[in-house]
């Protein structure tokens, strides 16, 4: 139960910190943190939680990561369902808190997106469904490659949180214009439910693509690195 609670809290922090920075701070007049600031915020949530709860749950914070680690032989199948439930509930709870905070500001309109992920007319840069699919698969594949490598027993000790957090920052820098960056089905779900409509209709992609990418990343890592000692 402790690990499930840790995943709930960790995913809550990721959504509140990452999506919160996008909704509340990215475009703040004169002092907005902008595109790069949002990317950094997502990375910082992972770094901070990895040090805080990594020793409790492994700090997955992401159904695709849990599934990828299972595919890579690093996580038991029996733990997948409760981990994913905890992650999704944490993301939804964070979305609710963020909605309450954001709705207290002048001019807030959840229909503007609320940091939701999307493609076609709902892509920040107008990217197609195919472009969004490829982007999310490839970004999540490399995210799992970094996670698998950084947490390998053969890797330098103590640096995994930094490597993983920086990888997530880089992923956001690349893909925010394409999909608003998911690579995390829980993160996508936690805000899409409050937007409704198109955000929920397009949510399927942000479950399917990250999971495919995560499994590919784990399998590729096993192929090139072999078994950990």
From Swiss-Prot:
SUPFAM superfamilies the UniProt entry points to: Aquaporin-like
Chief localization: membrane
One Pfam family from the record: MIP
Ranges annotated as spanning the membrane: 8-28, 33-53, 88-108, 129-149, 158-178, 192-212
Keywords on record: Cell inner membrane, Cell membrane, Membrane, Repeat, Transmembrane, Transmembrane helix, Transport
Short motif (NPA 2): ranges: 184-186
Reaction(s) this enzyme catalyzes, per UniProt: H2O(in) = H2O(out)
HAMAP family found in the cross-reference section: Aquaporin_Z (MF_01146)
Job description of the protein: Channel that permits osmotically driven movement of water in both directions. It is involved in the osmoregulation and in the maintenance of cell turgor during volume expansion in rapidly growing cells. It mediates rapid entry or exit of water in response to abrupt changes in osmolarity.
Family recorded in the similarity comment: Belongs to the MIP/aquaporin (TC 1.A.8) family.
Note on domains (UniProt): Aquaporins contain two tandem repeats each containing three membrane-spanning domains and a pore-forming loop with the signature motif Asn-Pro-Ala (NPA).
Protein name (Swiss-Prot/TrEMBL): Aquaporin Z
Organism: Chromobacterium violaceum (strain ATCC 12472 / DSM 30191 / JCM 1249 / CCUG 213 / NBRC 12614 / NCIMB 9131 / NCTC 9757 / MK)
Gene: aqpZ
């Amino acid at each position: 139960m402790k690990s499930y609670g840790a995943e709930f809290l960790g995913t809550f922090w990721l959504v509140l910190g990452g999506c919160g920075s996008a909704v509340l701070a990215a475009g703040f007049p004169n002092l907005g943190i902008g595109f790069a600031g949002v990317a950094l915020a997502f990375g910082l949530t992972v770094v901070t939680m990895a040090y805080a709860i990594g020793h409790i749950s492994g700090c997955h914070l992401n159904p695709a990561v849990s599934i990828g680690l299972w595919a890579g032989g690093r996580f038991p199948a029996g733990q997948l369902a409760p981990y994913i439930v905890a992650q999704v509930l944490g993301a939804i709870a964070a979305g609710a808190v963020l909605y309450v905070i954001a709705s207290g500001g002048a001019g807030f309109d959840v229909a503007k997106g609320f940091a939701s992920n999307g493609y076609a007319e709902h892509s920040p840069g107008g990217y197609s469904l195919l472009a969004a699919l490829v982007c999310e698969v490839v970004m999540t594949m490399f995210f799992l490659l970094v996670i698998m490598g950084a947490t390998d027993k053969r890797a330098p000790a103590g640096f995994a949180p930094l490597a993983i957090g920086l990888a997530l920052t880089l992923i956001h820098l690349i893909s925010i214009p394409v999909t608003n960056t998911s690579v995390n089905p829980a993160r996508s779900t936690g805000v899409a439910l409050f937007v409704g409509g198109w955000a929920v209709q397009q949510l399927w992609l942000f479950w399917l693509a990250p999971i495919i990418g995560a499994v590919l990343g784990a399998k590729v890592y096993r192929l090139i690195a072999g078994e950990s000692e």
